[in-house]
């Protein structure tokens, strides 16, 4: 399913449906296809919002959970969302947790799916290997409950990002 990405100032996001606001924060490998089933289900009863976290736009110093939480906080203030059902997946769950601990006045409920920060599967006994496609594929697969979620297109995208950001 393809969704229109809206822009309001510096913020890019998807917004579908009407009703109570459900904001979904994506993970590190945040392909919108990961949320398409949830968007399709809830857009009939909720305003579903998926802000595009600036994972590769922020400078390295601010590409942190704290930096992403600040970005998210400014986003919901800018859009004036209140009584939000906040759902975070993976890194997005970690950002949601930090946000709830700092600024809970706009959040009605919190839903976590595979949130980082609860249990971390480290990189293992090796250093990250740029240029090694097979290594990147395996690490990308480890990110998901179902390794088949790491499609060739997603692995290609991660491989490109890892090798460009030096």
Task: Spell out what each predicted region is.
Residues 1-22, 44-46, 60, 145:
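Alpha/beta-hydrolase fold catalytic core
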Residues 8-10, 14, 40, 49-91:
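Active-site loop/oxyanion-hole signature of alpha/beta-hydrolase fold enzymes
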Residues 19, 27-30, 90:
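Active-site glycine-rich loops that stabilize anionic/oxyanionic intermediates
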Residues 27-37, 48:
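Serine-hydrolase catalytic-loop signature spanning alpha/beta hydrolases and amidase-signature enzymes
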Residues 30-31, 54-57, 118:
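Active-site loop signature of alpha/beta-hydrolase-fold enzymes
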Residues 94-102, 107-138:
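Flexible "cap/lid" loop of the alpha/beta hydrolase fold
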Residues 130-166:
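Conserved alpha/beta-hydrolase catalytic His-Asp/Glu region
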């Amino acid at each position: 399913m393809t969704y229109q990405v809206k822009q309001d100032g510096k913020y890019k996001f998807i917004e579908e449906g009407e009703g109570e606001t459900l904001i979904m924060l994506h993970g590190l490998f945040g392909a919108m296809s990961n949320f398409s089933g949830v968007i399709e289900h809830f857009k009939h009863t909720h305003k579903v919002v998926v802000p595009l976290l600036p994972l590769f736009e922020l400078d390295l110093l601010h590409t942190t959970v704290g930096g992403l939480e600040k970005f998210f906080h400014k986003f919901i203030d800018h859009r004036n969302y209140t009584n939000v059902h906040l759902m975070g997946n993976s890194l997005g769950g970690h950002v949601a947790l930090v946000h709830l601990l700092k600024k809970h006045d706009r959040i009605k409920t919190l839903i976590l799916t595979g949130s980082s920060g609860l249990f971390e599967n480290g990189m293992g006994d090796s250093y990250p290997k740029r240029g090694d496609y097979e290594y990147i594929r395996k690490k990308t697969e480890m990110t998901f409950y179902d390794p088949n979620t790491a499609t060739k297109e997603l692995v290609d995208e991660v491989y490109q990002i890892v090798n460009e950001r030096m």
